[in-house]
Amino acid sequence: MAVSIEEFSRIIIATLDLNFQILENFFTLLVVSATNSSLVSQGANLNFSNVWGLIYGGLVSNYWNSFAIHEVLNATQHNVSAMKNFSIAINYLGSNATTVFGDAEGTKGVTYLQKGIYDYLKSNPQEAENLASSLSRMFKAEVEFLIKLMGAVNTTFT
């Protein structure tokens, strides 16, 4: 499959833009769900202490996942076959770094794609402006969410 770098860049930018909009809508939904007067009067509004509960759940899950990863890495140090595979993988990646990651000129690997995206934005200023608008709206929604979340700290943690 051959795709032009411009088409690839256009899709990447469109995906970034859409993801920024999704995050903006998600953070806005959290804030609006907490403050909507109809939900508040029904006692069905979002409680930011429960958002902290979700954050805590994610932390606990990650905590135990880290133990599992630690155990596997520890076992790898004592398994010659596993160490060999690990070494071969790192050596192979390192010896092909330019192929995978690219070069400073952006003519190979990941840097070729990154340079293509940069060139696309530079030659399509309206796309860059649209992306900047989505990013700034998402950031604003994140800040509004963060203010509500931090406002619940004292009522959540004892």
UniProtKB/Swiss-Prot annotation:
It comes from Archaeoglobus fulgidus (strain ATCC 49558 / DSM 4304 / JCM 9628 / NBRC 100126 / VC-16). It comes from the Archaea. This is Uncharacterized protein AF_0052.
